[in-house]
Amino acid sequence: AMVEQLQMTAQARHFDFFILSDTTDPDIWLREEAFWATTRAALSGEVGLYYRHRTDNTYRKSGNIRDFCERWGSQYRYMVVLDADSLLEGPTLVEMVRRMELDPQIALVQAPPAPVNRLSFFARMQQFSARVYGQVFNSGFALWVQDDGNYWGHNAIIRIEPFMDHCGLPKLPGVPPLGGEILSHDFVEAAMLREAGWKVVLDHDLQGSYEQCPTNLID
């Protein structure tokens, strides 16, 4: 759906998509590759669709993104990070790139995602709440933080060069939960970019940003 919407904007040739798999289940791995091959064959070729599976998922999501940056980051100016359950509409993707181009001091633009497509009572409460006051919250948050915004780990566009220069995460001394790998990597990466003098912004007016929320407290 994202590729189809991009094609409608006439800007699809400027985008490539990467499926960055970290699964340790061989059956899921095979299904992912089959889905990728089928989807790639169905595309017109205007948009690149690539699949990469890591056999060693060191540092989890942050390590997955680091691996992408080390392999392919030099070929791109920006990357848009998505979770498996999140998406951005085609016009929103184009607009995010436009805003990055307009201000070369911005390292990260976060598009606030609206929770969708869950049916449990817990999830429906979140979706209803976001619908009622999500825009007010995002507007107020953006007003207060200005260029000192945050990164929520997905549905954001990132300038790759400063991200690679400043966002290498250390392993904390001691034992978990206070030591070891940094799990809330997104907050730390945003702070590192700000410390290096780059802008991190929440653009509350961006529409067409979605994610699936947890269905219960355990998830």
Where in the sequence are the language-model features?
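Internal catalytic domains of large membrane-associated glycosyltransferases
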Residues: 1-219
